[in-house]
Amino acid sequence: MEMAVLHLSMLLRSKLVDRGGENLGRVEDVIVRLSDGAYPPVTGLKAHVAGRDLFVAAKMIAVLEPGRVQLAGDQLNFGRFERRRSEVLLRQDVLGHRLINVAGARLARASDIELAFNEGAWRVVGVDVSLRGPLRRRLPRQLGGRSAARTLLDWESVEPFVGHVPSSRLRMRFGKLSQLHPAQIADLVEAATHDEGEEIIRAVGADRELEADVFEELDLEHQVEFLHQRSDAEAANVLAKMGADDAADLLAELEQERREPVLSLLPKTQQRKVRTLLGFNPSTAGGLMNPDFLCLSERMAVKRALEEVKRSALEPEQLTVVFTHDSKKILSGALAIAALVCADPEARLADIVQRRPVSLHPDADLPEVARELTDFNLTALPVVDEEEHVIGVIAVDDVLELIFPEDWRRRFSAFSNE
């Protein structure tokens, strides 16, 4: 049996009639409860009757069709309509507003909303994000349903913004956003308005690690914008989960009077790393490096080295290369993780590493850093002190972000009407 489907645009301003067909008023909005499952059920209608806005419960509706809503009985509750907690009005709160197309990792605007009768109730099942939705709302009802093809998104693949909805218990849900890569979420934040971006950040805050990853992916302007509104303790919580190099860059952009209070709230180890990085010019090797890296004794066996890699707390992107040092802790070699995995487990690192790897001192400028990375086709470049001890590593992606145009990785807008 084919599922009954309606579009919100075809219901708005429809006649509201009693069981006998007598006109009572008109439909002003459709009310749903977002918290109830993947496809939220219609809980009722907002109707305009005799100069008043009334609530019509879903259980009172016998017929719901384009242009006409018929009640199961003759009586209405003539109490004024009042929004209840967790309720959303589809016309007022969703239609014409932006939402997140999670499947496409971009913003879109709701041009129309599709309802279907399923499991004993009318439910929101889809959103039309095409530019033709507004046109359909302006056409006569009999023509609107036959307008050009729609771009319909499954409701389960979208997340509406609800920060503007006057209800104290409504929040954007974290579950759908957690499906996205931090860089995709950052793209959404940067394409959104400030309030929309703040709503995304608040939702992502349910996972502190993900929140920090998203902050790392934001451009500096947006990082400062959203950190500025947080207390010192809240700012420190975000910075504590970020890489020390990213945390130092962001901390340097905070107001002078906030830097030390926020820095003092960081865990001691992170605090020490950040203080060290802040002592370097941000456009030099010292300012670009990440103080978290893996440098092992060249006398170590491959089998033991692999165990160290597994135990390492470094992020996967920081573990592309393992460096080695001699008995005096002087940099002696470099080896790609892929080569380490394929090596004889009993071999010593000294026998398989690339000897005398390229390195730079902290005062090397950005052009020199970029030149060494490109000339030697490196993904990671060690930074050494005067004694040739490794003090940090520069990743190629950190340099790319500086030498390419600001929006180089955002070739496609995160906002689209599909």
Model-derived regions: residue spans:
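Short, surface-exposed loop/turn motifs at beta-strand boundaries within globular domains
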Residues: S9, N23, A38-P40, H181-P182
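Hydrophobic packing positions in regular secondary-structure scaffolds
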Residues: D18, A57-A58, V63-G73, N77-G96, ...
